Structure formats: structure tokens, C-alpha cells
UniProtKB/Swiss-Prot annotation:
GO terms for biological process: mitochondrial translation; sporulation resulting in formation of a cellular spore. It comes from the Eukaryota. It is found in: Mitochondrion. Keywords: Mitochondrion, Ribonucleoprotein, Ribosomal protein, RNA-binding, rRNA-binding, Sporulation. GO terms for molecular function: rRNA binding; structural constituent of ribosome. Component of the mitochondrial small ribosomal subunit (mt-SSU). Mature yeast 74S mitochondrial ribosomes consist of a small (37S) and a large (54S) subunit. The 37S small subunit contains a 15S ribosomal RNA (15S mt-rRNA) and 34 different proteins. The 54S large subunit contains a 21S rRNA (21S mt-rRNA) and 46 different proteins. SUPFAM superfamilies: Nucleic acid-binding proteins (SSF50249). This is Small ribosomal subunit protein uS17m. Belongs to the universal ribosomal protein uS17 family. Present with 2810 molecules/cell in log phase SD medium. GO terms for cellular component: mitochondrial inner membrane; mitochondrial small ribosomal subunit; mitochondrion. It comes from Saccharomyces cerevisiae (strain ATCC 204508 / S288c). PANTHER family: 40S RIBOSOMAL PROTEIN S11 FAMILY MEMBER, SMALL RIBOSOMAL SUBUNIT PROTEIN US17M.
Length: 237
């Protein structure tokens, strides 16, 4: 006597040892509407080798009752989509972990640069205060020797303090000028792209935006500004 066979999809695995849940679709004729309908039924199926994965298309075959609800076993894996997905999932997890590690490294590098710049400014202000204290008290602490070497100063006076303050202000002015120049270049580039739809769409495509023609005007402008800013800031990183 031929054994009963079904084709089904593995919808659950790993919850019970050597057992998977397989969903089988069969056509059932409905007399009320005089039409065939798909009927779904889930079977608990024995998987001796525990090789089937969720998403696999399998052929199940009737066997002796293995438990109260389990009387089918995996006979053949027709299509191992579940195993392919499991492999893809593990590779995706590794890829995401690498990407997160790279982003974390970039963040820490940027923070380190900011902290170094802040430390330089703090050191300058601390040195100015040390010089002022030394001038008011008439003493020459050991720190003054280090300050001389750091800035190439021969003698300490109020003029020295003014020069160091000017050095700090000059640094701020340079940074401010750089920011202004960057903003001007971004605005110029943005205006250039917005005035030419072909250039604008090609620019977005080159930066990974799919089908920019279908985007709303405000969304397109925001994406354009984002990628222009990233391009302009890239050389300075």
C-alpha cells in the first residue's frame, strides 16, 4: 500500500527535538459555492537528521505513529530556501557587526580629534593664567620654563599675554572663516544642482538614490543637501 505523501513548507523548527512544523496546502471542493478552495493544515513532522530549516520546501511521508500528534517524517528536501536564508542571515549578522565596528571606530576617531583640539585651547588658556599669576606675584614657577619652550617665548610680560590671547583669537577666526567658506561652497553647489534637473538626478543616482525622478521636491532637496555636505566635508576628515 502506497504511503501518503504531501509537499509542504517548513514554518517552524528548533522548538522540539527532531521535530518541525510543516504547512501543507490542499485543494478542497466547497459544495456551497461550487468551487475549489485552498485548505491549510500544519503537521508535526519527524526530522531525524535535524537538517531542515524554516523556509525549506519538503516532501513528507506517512510513517508509524511517533507520538500522539506526529505520524509524518521528512522524506526529501525539495528546495532548501531555509538553509540558504540561514546562511545569508549569518553572513548579514557578520556584515552588520563589521559595519557597526567601523562606525564606532570613526566616531571614536572624531571624538579624539575634538578632544585634542579642546585640550589645545584649554592648555593655551591655562598657560595665560600661569603667566598672569607669575607676573602679579613676581615669582618664576617651573611651569614658565615649559611655557617658554612650548611657544618659543624669551621673556614674560603683559605683551606676552596679549600675544597669546591674540593667538587664541586668531585660531577662532581661522575656524570661523573655514566654516563660512564651507557654507558658501555648499550653497553654491546646491544652487547649481537645483537649477539643472539632469545634473541633480544624476548626482543623486551616483550617491545611491534609486529613481530620483519619483521623489517629491522637498525630499529631493533634503537628500541633495545631505550628500553635498558629505562630499564637501570629506576632504577635511
Amino acid at each position: 500500500m502506497a504511503r501518503q505523501n504531501f509537499l509542504g513548507l517548513v514554518v517552524s523548527q528548533g522548538k522540539m527535538q527532531k521535530t518541525v512544523k510543516v504547512r501543507v496546502e490542499t485543494k478542497v471542493f466547497n459544495k456551497k459555492i461550487n468551487k475549489e478552495l485552498f485548505h491549510r493544515r500544519d503537521y508535526l513532522v519527524h526530522d531525524e537528521g535535524e537538517i531542515s530549516r524554516e523556509g525549506d520546501l519538503v516532501r513528507i511521508e506517512a510513517t508509524r505513529p511517533l507520538s500522539k500528534r506526529k505520524f509524518f517524517a521528512i522524506a526529501e528536501i525539495i528546495r532548501n530556501k531555509g538553509q540558504q536564508f540561514a546562511l545569508y542571515e549569518s553572513e548579514a549578522q557578520l556584515s552588520v557587526a563589521k559595519e557597526e565596528a567601523q562606525k564606532a571606530k570613526e566616531f571614536l576617531d572624531k571624538r579624539s580629534v575634538r578632544e585634542n583640539k579642546l585640550n589645545e585651547k584649554t592648555t593655551l588658556l591655562r598657560d595665560i593664567r600661569t603667566i598672569q599669576d607669575a607676573l602679579s606675584s613676581g615669582s618664576t614657577p617651573k611651569e614658565l620654563l615649559e611655557i617658554k619652550q612650548r611657544y618659543g617665548i624669551q621673556d614674560f610680560s603683559q605683551e606676552t599675554v596679549r600675544q597669546l590671547l591674540q593667538l587664541d583669537i586668531s585660531g577662532l577666526e581661522v575656524n570661523l572663516e573655514k566654516q563660512r567658506s564651507l557654507i558658501d561652497r555648499i550653497q553654491t553647489r546646491l544652487s547649481e544642482l537645483l537649477s539643472n534637473d539632469l545634473k541633480c538626478d544624476q548626482f543623486l543616482k551616483d550617491h545611491g538614490v534609486e529613481d530620483p525622478l519619483t521623489l517629491k521636491k522637498n525630499i529631493k532637496k533634503n537628500l541633495l543637501r545631505k550628500h553635498v555636505m558629505m562630499d564637501m566635508q570629506q576632504p577635511s576628515q
